[in-house]
């Protein structure tokens, strides 16, 4: 009972073409122009979402390198979630665990993780710790309270400083002072 029905075979060919339109064989029964529209829609939707979630990566990569990265992600990664809003998390997992990093910027996976956590924390719901500013006396006599939404992260690369004009070629030497710790909170 493990046979593929003809429509299932056609669906698999269609999906294979959408994932790899440059190399996949055109499925029978489809007009090339129509398939091209679907492939472009898929790429554009991923581009729109991931460029918004990873703005630094989008800015530091050339348009060609960004396009190659997204096309590789679409072709190679099998998302485990049907939810569109979780695609950026899948993208980070792809960069960390699946992608051949030989030709990538050496800090790409760490930067993607940093940008994704930063975005998640910025939109996370949290209760205000105080409704009014504290006086100096209250600050000194009170018990410190951490923000309810916070992450302490450590990276090999100074991801919080990376941008179009700050692209390190080597990770900084560690001096024992944990200089690449990042505290993120909303």
Identify what each model region corresponds to.
Residues 1-125:
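N-terminal, charged low-complexity regulatory/assembly segments
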Residues 75-186:
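Hydrophobic packing positions characteristic
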């Amino acid at each position: 009972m493990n046979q593929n029905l003809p429509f299932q075979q056609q669906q698999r060919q269609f999906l294979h073409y959408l994932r790899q339109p440059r190399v996949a064989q055109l499925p029978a029964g489809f007009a090339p122009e129509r398939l091209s529209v679907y492939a472009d829609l898929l790429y554009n939707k991923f581009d729109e979402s991931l460029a918004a979630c990873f703005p630094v990566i989008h800015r530091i990569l050339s348009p060609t390198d960004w396009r190659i990265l997204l096309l590789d992600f679409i072709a190679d990664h099998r998302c485990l979630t049907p939810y569109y809003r979780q695609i950026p998390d899948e993208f980070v997992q792809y960069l960390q665990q699946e992608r051949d990093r030989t030709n990538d910027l050496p800090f790409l996976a760490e930067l993607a993780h940093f940008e994704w956590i930063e975005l998640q924390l910025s939109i996370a719901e949290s209760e205000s710790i105080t409704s009014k500013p504290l006086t100096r006396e209250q600050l000194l006599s009170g018990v410190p309270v951490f923000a309810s939404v916070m992450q302490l992260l450590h990276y090999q690369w100074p991801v919080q400083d990376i941008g179009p004009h700050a692209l390190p070629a080597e990770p900084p030497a560690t001096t024992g002072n944990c200089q690449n710790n990042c505290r993120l909170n909303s």
